[in-house]
C-alpha cells in the first residue's frame, strides 16, 4: 500500500511525521515519490470476521479501523495544508537538520512544477508498470469524481452504476468525507491536544476551507474505465484495490506564508521515527485487511488519496516536505519488518483461532459422540429389557398354557375315572337295592303272615281325554268330580238378566236386591253309578294308597309328629286322640287348661342321656343259648333305618337322594352286623327270695337289691297360693338360686361340675329351704347309705332341677371371668347377692363337695376335704321326674349292720351294661316298723321281724322301672 508523507499536523500518527513542509518554486525540480512495499492479501475473508479475530487476539488495539483511516486522511490533508500554507526562509543554514540539499531539492521541484505526477501502483505485478499517463489521468478523474460526490456534486457515473444515495447515506463516512472534514490549517495547539485526536477523534471542518482539494478533481470518462471499479469509495482494478499517490512537489503553496512551525513539530529525528512506525503499520495492516472486502463497513474501507490533476492556482511556489534517503530507506525497512511482524501475528492469531475452533469442534464431536454412545447404550438397554420382558411373558404364557393343558388332561382323567366309578357304584347300588327289596319283602311277609287283610276291590282306572292346557286330574278311590253347574239353567232368569243389562236403570239398587235375596242351597254332590263313566271321562284314577301294615292302626288313629326347632327335647312321634272344644279354627291361640298344663316347661325338664358304652367287648362272648327260637324272633326286629324316614329328627341335608343313600348304608351296616352272628341276649328273670338279717350268705342278693335303694327328699309344706300360677316358676327359680349361691359364687369349676354337685345334694336332701349353704348341717356330709332320707312327695318343689334349668339360672345371675380378687371363677352379680343378703360369701367358695371333682380343681380350691373311708364314692341316683313316680311299686327291704360281701352276679343279665346310668330310674325304699321310724337305716330293730322280697312270681325288670 502506498502512502504520502505526513506533516506535523495533529492526527493518529502525528508523532510519526518525519518530513517538513516548505514552499517550493513553481517550476518542478524533481519527482519525489514515497511508497510502501507491496503487500499480499493473507485471507479473503469478510471484514466482520477479520475484525472479530483481531478484537479477540489483540486486546491492545482498542481503536477502530475507521479512526485509523480518518487519521490517514487527516495526515494527507495536513500535507496539503503544508503545501499551501508553509512559509519558510530558504537560507543555507540548517533548519531542523536540513541543509543545502534541501534547497537543491526545492530548486528541482520548482523546475518540475508543470510536469504531471507519476502514479506507481506497487500492488500490481512488476510486469505491468504504469508507463504512460493514461492511468494517472484516470485515477485523477476517479479521485475528483469521488471528491465531488462528497462535496455535494452529483456523480452521474455513480448513479449509472446503480449506487443509490440512500445506501451512501446509510453507510458511514467514506475516506473522502474524512479528508474533507479535516481542517486545512494546523494550529500550534494541535500537538498538545492531539492525544484524543490521534486515537480517532479527528477535527472536523467545512469543505470550503480546502478549495484546492475539491476544485481540481475531474471526472473519468466512460470509455477510460475499462477494468476499473469503485465500491464504497475504494478503487479496484479487477479484484485488487489501488492506492493513488500524488506528487507532493507539483502542488503550489498558497499565497500566504504558513506560520512558523516549532521545532517540536518539525521533521523528527531517526530515533523518533521507529516509535511511530507500529501505529502506522497497524493502521496500514488494518486498511489492507479491510480493503479486500468490498461489502465491509466504512470503518474498514481503505482511504484513496486525493489527486490534483489540474494546475495549481498558486504558481509562485509549491510546499515540499524534505525526506532524507536514509530516513526513507529506514522507514521502508521498518515498515517491511512491521508488515512481516503483522503477518506473523496475524498468522499466529489465525492459527490460534483455527486451533481453538478445531478444539471446539473436537469437543463438540466428542460430546456428540458421547451423547450418541449414551443414547445407543440406552436403546440397547431398552431393547434388551424389552426382549427380556417379552421372553418372560412368552415363558409365562407357555407355562400357563402347559398348566392349563395339564389341568384339562387331569380333569379329563378324573372325569373318566369318576364316570367309571359312578357306573360301578350304580351297578352295585342297583344290585344292593334289589337284594334289599327282596329281604324287606321277605321280612314283611314274615311279619304280616299272622294278619290276614281283606283284599279291597281295586277302583277301575279310566283315562280321560284331552283337556287342553290343563293336565289330567288324578282322582282316587271314593272321589268324584263336582258338577260344573249345580243348579238347572232357567231361561226366564236369563231373559231377565238381558233386560236389566239393556235398560241400565238407576232406580234399581243392587244392594237392596242382595239384602232381599236368599242364598241358594244345594245338597252334597251325588253322582249315580250309571253316570260315573260319563262324568269321569276326563279323569285318571290312580291306585289307592296301601294301608299301613302296623296292627291296630285304625284303632289308635294316625301317627302324629310334634316338633319345635327351638326345643332341645326330641320331637314326639305317636298318636294323639284327645279332643278339645276350646281351641277352634276361629280361635287357634286359645288355651285348654283342662287338657294341658301350660305352666310346665317340658323342655327344661328334659335331660340328655349319657352316651352308652360300646358293645365291642361282647364280640367274643359265647352264646350258648342261641337256638331256633332266635331265628324265629329275628323277623320281628325292625331293621335299622326302617320306618324312620322324616320321623322325629330334622335332617341337616334336605337332599332326598343323600338321605336315601344314608339310610341304605345304615341298613347295610345292620345286615353286616346280623351276618356276623351278633344277637341280643334274651332277658332272663332273676328270682331273689327273702333275705334274713342274720343270713350272711345273702350278701350277693342284698347287693343286687341295694342298687335300687330309694332316697327320700325332704318334704316341704306347700306355700299358700297367694300369687297366680304364672309366678310359680319364678318362685321356684328364686328358691333354687338361693340354695345355689354358696356353691356358685367363687367356684372355679365348670358349669357341668356345679350342676352335678347341686343335683346330687338335692337328691340326698342336703339342701334345706331356709339354709343357704350346706355347711350348717353337712360339715361332713353323711353317705347316702346310713342317712335316713325323708319321704318325698310329688310336689314340684322337692323335684331335682333339670340341667337346662340350672344352666339358665347360672348364666342369668353370674358370669365367669377374671377379677383382681381371684383368678378365673364364677362371680354372682352384686345385686343378686344383695337381694339374698349373701354379700359375705367368700372367694373362692368353701363348699364341701359330695361328688368327685377334677384333681386340679380340688387342689386349686384348697377347701375340699378328702373323702373318708366310710364315705366312699357315691352312687349316682339320678331321677328324671321324681314328682311323677309311684312309690307304692317298690317293696320294703332291711339291711343288717355288717358289710355286704361281694358275690357273683353272672346270673343277672341285662340288655346293656349301662346300669350306672339307668339305676337312677328306680328307687328302693326301706320301710321300717312303727317303732323303728326314728332309727337309722341299717340298724337292727327291736322287733326283729324278718322282712323279705319275693320276686318269684312277679319279676320286675330294670327296663320296666324306666320312667319317661
Curated annotation (Swiss-Prot):
The modification Phosphoserine is found at residues 126, 141, 144, 312, 773, 783, 811, 876, 881, 959. It is found in: Nucleus. The modification Phosphothreonine is found at residue 723. The keyword Nucleotide-binding does not apply. One of its GO terms (biological process) is DNA replication-dependent chromatin assembly. Residues 284-298, 770-780 have a biased composition (Low complexity). Residues 662-964 are annotated as: Binds to p60. There is a cross-link at residue 185 (Glycyl lysine isopeptide (Lys-Gly) (interchain with G-Cter in SUMO2)). There is a cross-link at residue 185 (Glycyl lysine isopeptide (Lys-Gly) (interchain with G-Cter in SUMO1)). Residues 1-49 are annotated as: Binds to PCNA. Residues 601-612, 620-635, 904-920 have a biased composition (Acidic residues). Keywords: Cell cycle, Chaperone, Chromatin regulator, Coiled coil, DNA damage, DNA repair, DNA replication, Isopeptide bond, Nucleus, Phosphoprotein, Ubl conjugation. The keyword Transit peptide does not apply. Disulfide bonds: none annotated. Residues 949-964 have a biased composition (Polar residues). Signal peptide: none annotated. Residues 156-172, 331-437 have a biased composition (Basic and acidic residues). Residues 146-232, 253-437, 601-641, 769-799, 859-878, 897-920, 933-964 are annotated as: Disordered. A motif (PxVxL motif) lies at residues 236-249. Residues 644-680 are annotated as: Necessary for homodimerization and competence for chromatin assembly. Residues 1-316 are annotated as: Binds to CBX1 chromo shadow domain. Contains one Pro-Xaa-Val-Xaa-Leu (PxVxL) motif, which is required for interaction with chromoshadow domains. This motif requires additional residues -7, -6, +4 and +5 of the central Val which contact the chromoshadow domain. Homodimer. Part of the CAF-1 complex that contains RBBP4, CHAF1B and CHAF1A. CHAF1A binds directly to CHAF1B. Only minor amounts of RBBP4 are complexed with CHAF1A and CHAF1B in G1 phase. Interacts with PCNA; the interaction is direct. Interacts (via the PxVxL motif) with CBX5; the interaction is direct. Interacts with MBD1. Interacts with histones H3.1, H3.2 and H3.1t. Belongs to the CHAF1A family. This is Chromatin assembly factor 1 subunit A. The gene is CHAF1A.
